[in-house]
A protein has these predicted regions:
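Short, charged, surface-exposed hinge/linker loops at domain edges
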Residues: 1-4, 33, 37-67
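Short aromatic-glycine-(Arg/Gly/Cys) micro-motifs in beta-strand/loop hairpins
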Residues: 8-22
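Intrinsically disordered, low-complexity segments enriched in proline/serine/threonine
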Residues: 22-25, 60-62
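A short, exposed loop/beta-hairpin motif centered on an aromatic-Gly-Thr core
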Residues: 23-33
Length: 67
């Protein structure tokens, strides 16, 4: 499974990061790195919950960060 994290800076200075392949994985951070870290953690949590609920089968995961 190939996932990507996209980020952008909001007008108020906060950073927004999301994983488009996982609806609902959208987080804010004070810095870009903070937002990216939070998005990665949330994405892994969502995938783990899906596996626990039998909604998928284990497969290698690759997460890339869009520039």
């Amino acid at each position: 499974m190939q996932l990507s994290i996209e980020s952008e800076r909001e007008e108020d200075g906060r950073w927004l990061a999301e994983v488009p392949q996982l609806p609902g994985v959208l987080v804010y951070g004070k810095t870009r790195n903070e937002a990216l870290s939070k998005a990665q953690i949330l994405a892994l949590r969502v995938l783990a919950e899906r596996l626990e609920n039998g909604e998928g089968s284990p497969e290698p995961i690759s997460i890339s960060i869009a520039a």
